[in-house]
Amino acid sequence: MSAGDHERNDAWQRAVRAQFPIIAAHPELAYLDSAATSQKPQAVLDAVHTYLTSSNANAGRGTYPWANRTTEAVERARRRVAQFLGDPAPGHSTVHLTSGTTEGLRSVARDWLTGYLTDGDEILVPYADHRANLAPWLEAQDLLAARGVHVRVRPLPYQEASGDYDHRALSSVVGPRTRFVAATHVHHVYGGDMNVHRLRAAVGPDVPICLDAAQSVGHLPLRLDDPALDVDFVVFSGHKAFALPGTGAVWARNTRGPALRVGGWQGTPNTVGAVSLTAALDWLDTLGVDRVNAHVSALTTRLTDQLRHLPAYDVLGCPASLASSTELPTAQRRHGIVTFRHRDIRSDDLGFILYSHGFMVRADSLCQAGVDDTGGKDGSVRVSLHVYNTENEIDRLLAVLASLE
């Protein structure tokens, strides 16, 4: 990058950072926990304030102007999600607003999968990803068993060293009764792109795939109109993509198997959350997700390149050996998440030390399926980045980590 390009990038980054009031108000702190939740730009806060002070009402329960505007706001959020994701099947697809990824995955499991599977069917699910992408499928298995329908849940093969799915081993677990696959787009611990586009070739053209996109929406240019991303459900959390807590969505293609129909009386929707979700996606489109991805990827590379030279730390997933293999280089495979352990300091203790220096990180088992120890050998420290983070924050973090060698 030339000096001029560097100056322009710095100016862009300062302008973006200034749009986050909580970040601007605390320059002494570095928020490095965006995989847990994102901070909110002024545009989202303004949209919420405008709605609450001009047309706050219930949706679908009145004919007066405030109620009509609220109903339209909820419908607009659904349309905005479909547009943002590049909906390739607008004549068939549906968008259901949820409280987040966990509820969204449960909805697919409870409201769709339990009506789709028959006795003897098999499903492939990730046993080494976030617990929210495992528990709903096991719960669905139990619900079906109570009805006398017995299905087999098989682990999606993965490579322990990298955290990536073992695409070569998929052929050994895919069979004639494979009816459904659940997968993760970007791993919440390792930050790796899980190469989900390769799943379709392995499972065939007729098996529905559900994608947990909690760590990719808002980070990567996820476009469902790209034939390489041929999935049937996309589930994500709005609060990780600059919207308010308690927001999320399920996009359903509805061309493989029955249409997703969320069961039961829905009650009052999260109208404020819907307004915030639309505003957040508008803001992201204006900023440019490609630009966000480039900025965060550069910071991720800066951190991983230096952290690997500190002998006291073990970086989890995406090992350096991949950089010289036929796979994508390590730095390109990480998307804003770097997780590590100190060889002598417990992860929870390291988290406290880092906060004493102004760094807010996640330090525990990270909700990873099969990991229960929150602070000992199975615990880890996760640094997760977003558009408001800076090179200076990365360099200061590295200096503190180096001092603990």
What is the meaning of each model-derived region?
Residues 1-405:
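Pyridoxal 5′-phosphate
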